[in-house]
Amino acid sequence: MAPNIRKSHPLIKIINNSFIDLPTPSNISSLWNFGSLLGVCLIAQIITGLFLAMHYTADTSMAFSSVAHICRDVNYGWLIRNLHANGASFFFICIYLHIGRGLYYGSFLYKETWNIGVILLFLVMATAFVGYVLPWGQMSFWGATVITNLLSAIPYIGNVLVQWIWGGFSVDNATLTRFFAFHFLLPFIIAGASILHLLFLHETGSTNPTGLNSDPDKVPFHPYFSYKDLLGFLIMLTALTLLAMFSPNLLGDPDNFTPANPLITPPHIKPEWYFLFAYAILRSIPNKLGGVLALVLSILILALMPLLHTSKQRSLMFRPFTQIMFWALVADTLILTWIGGQPVEDPYTMIGQLASVIYFSIFIIMFPLMGWVENKLLNW
């Protein structure tokens, strides 16, 4: 009998074991779709980004007008730009839902997969930040100035570090050029890290909503979940197209329609919506270094999740007390997102400080405590 090329060819065999014959738990819900949706987002962003880079000029005197040129003069340039800008928002919607799924169902106990995921989150955030600077509007310029300036809080080397990143004494042409270089390079590093993420995931296999061992009940990935993923792609790409076609500027900042001007500071400097929760945590601490540390820790705390897991059950499916804490965390993150977009004045400052304390308390105190309480209630 002739060997099956799908199972014998060195390259096709890898694809087969990852996407076709992969044994998958039969009961995973639609929340398990977001990994593949992130892959689609990344591919879409790389393709649209590549076409934008063909027409974009990374120079302070031309960047803003080159973006206008893309939207006005390039065939379907407006569509490519709108898909790219709003694609970033969909990327973050998917990534936050993906992380939420991981927290809820205990996926963080696969430590290698989880830690690469945390690194991926940092990489995606860095990519989005440097990308936001490229159109060289007011919010691009001042966002870059404010966020890079945070590094000056690092003792001893801070000021030197900031000037080194800027390539001068302020955000200028050198900064824009290097940010374009980073923005072009990072998505390919993300793609590489994503392959590692999958590699480690396939060492163990997926979790499932119950958190129990699913070895006795596996089904092949194709056709069951390949078609299920396809439906997810269709829904997301439809939503993205609708947003890009009908209200492309819904999630943007009006200040970015004004070319960058170092002499005029916008009244409210704020990042894109997907960074607002972390920005609110940064602003809630009066000390500069303290704020920067809180900002980094608000993301890095995810890496501590395996250490903070006290329950003898993996998933939250049968753990009502921790479920309440999880949804409190979701609500708190939404409150932080709202506060991050508000001016620095009462009552917003107070709400932000309270929400920041609650954010860290849920992770560090409530999750481990509730796990312990649930163990006791079950006489474990």
UniProtKB/Swiss-Prot annotation:
Describe the family membership recorded for this protein in Swiss-Prot or TrEMBL: Belongs to the cytochrome b family.
An example molecular function term from Gene Ontology annotations: metal ion binding
Q: Which residues bind heme b b566?
A: 98, 197
Can you name this protein? Cytochrome b
Free-text remark on how the cofactor is bound: Binds 2 heme b groups non-covalently.
Q: Mind telling me which GO cellular component terms the entry cites?
A: membrane; mitochondrial inner membrane; respiratory chain complex III
Q: Where, subcellularly, is it found? A: Mitochondrion inner membrane
Q: Which organism is it from?
A: Xenopus laevis
